[in-house]
């Protein structure tokens, strides 16, 4: 019925003995959590009682695994114009993850780095298992395929969530760039805006941080409100400060469910 570690929990109704047997103690994984059934016998007098018992068992499992899941999605520019800011970017991102690990509730993380092409560094990983970003991973170069990065990533996460047994309660997408779109091949502003608008209707929220561009205008073109856009200075101090802003906004948004400013 449930599997894990190449072992099974077996539920058997033996009508001739009118008893429910649970197999020897087994551990299994469900929803990222380990469960254990002990050896034992549970007497049932008829098939109706058996069904009631199974329903109760499934209800307990459902309650145990129905956690509020937060999904954090980072889409980070590593084009050539970020040269010289690698250590600040790496340090800032790692600091955000370290602090977010201390927040309550289950969290999964996706991190996509983009220039002319995209690279997925973390693919919906439980935050406790997210390793620090390294210089090898954040190696700058190339152009800025911002629209492709956002469109491809948002659509991929959307599809994954739709096929998940466990439902994500809050999805927060953080987009960081230091320049204008200049090399996307698949997505246009209209495509991205339509995609973001649909996901906002599904409860997602987006934060756009940019430098050397009209940040509010760029955000609006993609369907992200001005109130969720942040301008930062593209130097060492500015990048560090920007990641402090990201951490603060994420912590607040996780409690509220969105990046929207306080009333």
Where on the chain are the PLM-derived regions?
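Aromatic (phenylalanine/tyrosine) cluster motif
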Residues: 2, 8, 13, 17, ...
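Acidic, low-complexity intrinsically disordered regions
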Residues: 4, 30, 41-46, 50, ...
């Amino acid at each position: 019925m449930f599997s894990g570690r190449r072992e099974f929990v077996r539920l058997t109704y033996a009508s001739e003995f009118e008893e429910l047997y649970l197999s020897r103690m087994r551990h299994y994984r469900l929803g990222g959590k380990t469960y254990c059934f002990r050896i034992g016998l549970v007497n049932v007098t008829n098939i109706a009682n058996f069904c009631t018992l199974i329903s109760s068992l499934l209800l307990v499992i459902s309650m145990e695994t129905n956690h509020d899941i937060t999904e954090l999605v980072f889409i980070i520019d590593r084009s050539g114009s970020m040269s010289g800011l690698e250590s600040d970017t790496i340090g800032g991102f790692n600091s955000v993850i370290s602090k977010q690990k201390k927040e309550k509730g289950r969290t999964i993380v996706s991190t996509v780095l983009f220039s002319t092409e995209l690279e997925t560094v973390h693919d919906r990983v439980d935050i406790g298992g997210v390793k620090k970003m390294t210089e090898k991973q954040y190696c700058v170069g190339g152009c800025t395929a911002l629209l492709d990065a956002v469109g491809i990533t948002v659509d991929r996460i959307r599809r994954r969530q739709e096929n998940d047994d466990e439902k994500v309660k809050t999805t927060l997408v953080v987009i960081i760039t230091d320049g204008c779109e200049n090399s996307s091949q698949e997505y246009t502003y209209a495509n991205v805006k339509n995609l973001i608008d649909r996901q906002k209707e599904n409860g997602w929220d987006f934060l756009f941080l940019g430098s050397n561009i009209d940040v509010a205008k760029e955000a609006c073109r993609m369907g992200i409100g001005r109130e969720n856009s942040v301008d930062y200075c593209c130097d060492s101090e500015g990048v560090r400060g920007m990641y402090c802003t990201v951490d603060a906004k994420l912590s607040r948004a996780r409690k509220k469910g969105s990046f929207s400013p306080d009333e």
